[in-house]
Each structure stands twice: as C-alpha cells, then as structure tokens.
Curated annotation (Swiss-Prot):
Pfam families: SurE. Nucleotidase that shows phosphatase activity on nucleoside 5'-monophosphates. This is 5'-nucleotidase SurE. It comes from Beijerinckia indica subsp. indica (strain ATCC 9039 / DSM 1715 / NCIMB 8712). The gene is surE. Its main location: cytoplasm.
Amino acid sequence: MRILITNDDGINAPGLAVLERIASALSDDVFVVAPESDQSGVAHSLSLSDPLRLRKISDRRFAVKGTPTDCVIMGVRSILIEQKPDLVLSGVNCGQNLAEDVIYSGTVAGAMEGTILGIPSIALSQCYEAGTGGRSGIAWDCAEVHAPGIIKHLLETGIDPDVVINLNFPACPASEVTGLAVTAQGRRDATTIKIDPRQDGRGLPYYWIAFARDTRQPGVGTDLEAVAQKRIALTPLRIDLTDDPTMTRLAQSLPKTLPKVAG
C-alpha cells in the first residue's frame, strides 16, 4: 500500500514526524510531500498566482513552497504520477480541528484534496489543553498509539468516495483515552472569536484574531463532546456541501419562471 502524507504545520513539524511513524506502521511505501513553512489556517486554498517550488529532501521526502492542497496535487499529479497513492494522510496537526475548525483547517483540506482526487483520505489532529503546558506539553503518543489501528479498520471497512475522515485525538496520554466515538461535526459559540488590538514600537496599531474559551456544554454526539470525554472523535465529512432538504424545499416553493421585482 502506497501512502502519501502531508500536513499544514510544515515539513519540520513534530506532528509530521509522528505521522511518518504512524504511516510506517501500516506500510513500507510512504512518501512525504509537505509545505516548506507553516500553513495553518489556509483552508483549501490553491496557489494560482505564484509558481510552486519543490525541494527534494530525499527520495521519499519533499517540501513544497505552497499550501497543503498544493502538496497533495504535487504528490499525486507529479511526484507519484506513475503510481498514485492508495491512501492520503494529513497531519498530525498540533491542535484540534473540531466543529467549524474544519472550514479553516489546512490539515483537513489536505485530506479533502486527496478525496477529490479519488484517494481514500484521513485528517489527524492532536488536541492539547492551553492551560497545561500548551503545545510544549502535547501528548503526541495519543495519536501515535491509537491511529494505526483505527486507520487499518477504516481501510478494511471502506471509506465512501465522497467522504473524508476527520480524526481528533483528545488532550491526554494514550493510556487515558476512554474510547472511540463516531461523531457529528459540532458547533461553537460564534461570539468566542474576537479581534485583539495591539500597538507596535512606533505606536502603530496591529491586530491578532483571538479566541475565547467556549463555556457552553458541547452538543450531544458531537466531536466537541467526544474529546471533552477523552474519547477519539471520528467524524465523516462530505465533499458535497449541498443541503438536500433546503434544495428540495426551494425547488418546491420557488416559481418556475424568474420572479420579478416591482419597481
């Protein structure tokens, strides 16, 4: 089985090294094509105005000056064009990709691009608690220990062609995980996102996008609830964003001819 791995934290990120070990536990045919620098939050962006620069690190490791989406396309349509991957893995992200995070996530986008290209794809993210050492105290062993078995089972069961799997590992050591939950995508309180104004040394303003802690109870059956209970959240996401009930309702309610505005 040929595996292509990527991420959004960059070629030197510790989570990518974790994912290389996860992939190596499943296959000896593993290729890495990852961004040259941190691409967190770039979502599914594609480089159309700048050329892609490819740096070959070794026969199986490459860095691309581009986004996670660029990396997957480069891997599938160029580096591995003679024999495309059987699986795309994206991650392991340093931090959660839960709820509406999936809209912004380069990690999830890397897996989505794999799915669009017709390859079973999985995004992996390792949660951490900001108040307990933050990134420096992240429990990478949680993903490293549990991911291989979950991925193997998913491949045996089969992943639908229009679906990308989003895995989030709770902020705890592997030994403290309480189980695996198949979940729905959650929803946070939108008021938690804010602008944090600052001032530089010359007195000029600059700004950070910041997030406050969401104090609401997570929805039942969601990815947010699962990781709060120290369970691994497995969320199937669709590439097709069509809302079928709304499509049906509007098709039935709108007139067959173009409505005219009185004026």
